[in-house]
Amino acid sequence: MTSLLAVIRHGPTEWNELGKIQGRTDIPLSERGKRAIQQLQLPDFVSEIDWITSPLSRAIETGKLLGITEMLIDDRLVETNWGDWEGHVLRDLRAKYGQEMLDNEKKGLDLTPPGGESPRQVCQRLQPLLFDIAASHQQKLIGAITHKGVIRSLLSLAAGWD
């Protein structure tokens, strides 16, 4: 059972431009982000594959701007829950929490923000999605529009990082 998953990260938002941690906060694409996505041109075959997307507006809007007319929303593709860190700049969190923050960042897949989820938990959320894709799209390519934290977790699963 072989399937291929092509992954696209959503376009930039105002929070991306300010360096703020977004997580599940539903921030739309910025005007600059919309223009950046509109300048991209995907290969013609992209319109012929099945697409899934995060439920967050920035991912859905990215798909629409790319000309993808049909997308299945899958909650498992939602961005990492960064809990209490959402809306903050990482530099500010490091300044506020000092060594505690640096120690947290060294935890890798087990880094868990207060009130949030770890990359390992994101991997656990994604594994059933990957099995579903493999079962329903045998020998086919499927596209996904999602977020940086999810893409990092997908890479972790693909590479066997722990």
What residues fall within each predicted segment?
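Active-site-adjacent alpha-helix immediately C-terminal to a catalytic or transition-state-stabilizing loop
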Residues: 2, 14, 60, 68, ...
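Active-site-proximal alpha-helix that buttresses catalytic centers in soluble enzyme cores
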Residues: 2-3, 8-72, 96
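Short, function-defining helix-loop hinge/capping sites that tune catalysis or transport
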Residues: 17-18, 83-84, 155-156
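A general structural signal for well-ordered alpha-helical segments in protein cores
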Residues: 37, 59, 90, 98-102, ...
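Short beta-strand scaffold positions
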Residues: 53-54, 124, 145-146
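Short secondary-structure boundary segments
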Residues: 55, 75, 148
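Phosphate-handling substructures
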Residues: 66-127
